[in-house]
C-alpha cells in the first residue's frame, strides 16, 4: 500500500495483518512487555509486509495462503513465497495468544545459565487446560493422539526448544482425501481427519509443504538411489539402471500395501509457536526461552485452536493409530 507525499512514495503498514488483541504501544499481559511485543510482532510484520509488497502487486489483493500456493512451484518466485510464508506463520502464531495472569516479564529477574540445567516437574498441575475453558473436543483429540495432556505439553515445548534459530512448532491435524471420491459419480468427497501431530518448520517453512505426494516422491527417490548405489558397489554397474527400476516398482507396491494408495494427505494447522529469538530475547534474555514457552502455554486461547479443528473429525479414528 502506497501513500504519496510530494514527490516521494512512502509505504504504509497494511492493516490487513492486524490482530485486534495486539495494540501498538501496549503489552500483551503476562507474555510480552511493550518493547517485547513491538519487536516480536509489529516491527517484524511491518518489515515483511513491505518486502512482500516490493515483490508483487498482488500482496494486497490475495490471501497469504493463495500467494504461497500459486508461487510455490516457481523457483523465480521463491522470495514471494518466503515473505508470504513468514507473514502467515507469524500472524497465525500470534492469533492464538491472548496473554495470561503471570507477573509481567519486565518485572521478573533475568534467568542465568542455571536455567539450562533445570529439570521439568512432571508432577506439576497443568495450568490452562483446554478442558477448563470448555474445549472438551480439543482435549479429547489431544489425549487420543498424544496419550495425555502432559505428554502433549512436554512434546510441544521440547520441540520448540530444539529449534536454535528461526522456526515454528505446529500442532496440525492430518487430513486424508480419498482420490476416488473426486470422480463425477461420487460428488461428496470422503474427507477424514484422523490424527493430530506436532512438527517443526524452519525459517519460512509452513505445514503447506508437508503433503503425502511430495514426501512419497522424496522417499521414492531416496529408495531408488540407495538400491542403485548398492548395485554399483556390488560391481553390477550394467544392472544398476534395471535395479533402480525394480526398486521403484517395489517401493510403489509396498506403499500401496501400507495404505497410502489412493490417498492425498495434507496437514491443517491448529496452533503455531514462534521459536525465533526475535520473539523472546527482549523480555526473557539469552537463557529464558523455556520461561517464554511456559508463558506461551498459559497464554494460548484454546477456543481459537479448537475452532480450527475440522468439524468432521472422526474421533474414533484417533484410537486406531
From Swiss-Prot:
Belongs to the mitochondrion-specific ribosomal protein mS43 family. It comes from Saccharomyces cerevisiae (strain ATCC 204508 / S288c) (Baker's yeast). Component of the mitochondrial ribosome (mitoribosome), a dedicated translation machinery responsible for the synthesis of mitochondrial genome-encoded proteins, including at least some of the essential transmembrane subunits of the mitochondrial respiratory chain. The mitoribosomes are attached to the mitochondrial inner membrane and translation products are cotranslationally integrated into the membrane. Residues 1-13 form a transit peptide. Keywords: Mitochondrion, Ribonucleoprotein, Ribosomal protein, Transit peptide. GO terms for cellular component: cytoplasm; mitochondrial inner membrane; mitochondrial small ribosomal subunit; mitochondrion. The gene is MRP1. This is Small ribosomal subunit protein mS43. Present with 2840 molecules/cell in log phase SD medium. Its main location: mitochondrion. PANTHER family: 37S RIBOSOMAL PROTEIN S26, MITOCHONDRIAL, SMALL RIBOSOMAL SUBUNIT PROTEIN MS43. Component of the mitochondrial small ribosomal subunit (mt-SSU). Mature yeast 74S mitochondrial ribosomes consist of a small (37S) and a large (54S) subunit. The 37S small subunit contains a 15S ribosomal RNA (15S mt-rRNA) and 34 different proteins. The 54S large subunit contains a 21S rRNA (21S mt-rRNA) and 46 different proteins. mS43 forms a heterodimer with mS42, building a large protuberance adjacent to the mRNA channel exit in the mt-SSU body.
